[in-house]
């Protein structure tokens, strides 16, 4: 990669091709707030915010949880009775947990994300 070092009086930011994480907040603010409510409920139930990552056989158990919430949603139950939150937020939270477990297992992909 080469950089243009000339000063033309305009600001430059060489971030082409890098992850646009901030865009998530602008594009999906309500969905992220809903997922955040799931996290808030979880930290009240399990005080250690990293508890989810310590669960034995977490990948399979969170996959099962995702599927349970998805099936309940498709069966017509929109809101989880325990949390009073829509099942779709739990589906998304579980998908994020599954993605993290995947990255823990595949360190080469994890390292590539942070380049």
PLM region spans:
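Intrinsically disordered, low-complexity regulatory regions
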Residues: 1-115
């Amino acid at each position: 990669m080469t950089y243009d070092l000339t000063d033309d009086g305009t600001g430059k930011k060489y971030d082409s091709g890098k992850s646009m994480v901030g865009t998530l907040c602008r594009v999906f603010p309500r969905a992220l707030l809903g997922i955040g409510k799931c996290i808030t409920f979880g930290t009240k139930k399990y005080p250690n915010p990293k508890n989810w990552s310590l669960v034995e056989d977490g990948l399979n158990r969170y996959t099962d949880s995702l599927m349970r919430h998805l099936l309940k949603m498709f069966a017509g139950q929109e809101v989880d009775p325990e949390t009073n939150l829509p099942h779709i937020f739990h589906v998304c939270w579980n998908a994020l947990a599954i993605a993290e477990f995947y990255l823990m297992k595949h360190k080469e992909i994890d390292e590539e994300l942070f380049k």
